[in-house]
Amino acid sequence: MRMLDDAALLRGGELVTYNEITQVLRSMVIVVDDREKDTPLLHQRLTSFPCAFMRKRLDFGDYTAEVTLPNGEKFSLADKVVVERKYDLTEICGNFTTNRIRFAKEFDRAAAAGAKTYILIENGSWEKIHKGAYRSKMTPASLLGSLTTWLARYNCQIIFCESTSTSWLIHAFLLHEMREALTHYEMPQKPKRTRKSAEEDIIK
């Protein structure tokens, strides 16, 4: 596959311009895992996205995105880039203690697919971890050790934010990841229409 710069992607042997990529990005839909609990906070988050959203079962992660390509096909980041959202440090402590095996298996599935995961932790910071400013028996050293182990073991990034920033951050991550993915994506070529096939269509 040819590697292209930000100005173009390959479509059936033809270069697609930056403007055409921008047009495809306008069709972007954020996909939300249907296991995200249906709460007023979730509803507020979803309706704050500057694009459409839909709920669907994901193999890993809580959020990803898909677009409609010029040939009408869907292109998804579900096996490439996802966002894993945590409400606070207390929730991530639960993932690293009570639910550690299940949590690790989810990241193992992402790793097997070659996917990148953004771990978005609301209402937290490295400083709060250091001070133990959360509700859990997990020590600051253990929590720090688990988070840095995940960084070393998996293709992931840990981002801290306020809960009011979650919607636009998820959208920003997925929008620019989608742009990068499209830049290096080669669309399937449509079969060339020959005189014979045209004549056969007329007969039909």
Protein language model regions, located:
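Non-catalytic C-terminal interaction segments of nucleic acid-processing enzymes
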Residues: 1-78, 90-204
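Conserved catalytic cores of phosphodiester-cleaving nucleases, focusing on short active-site segments
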Residues: 81-87
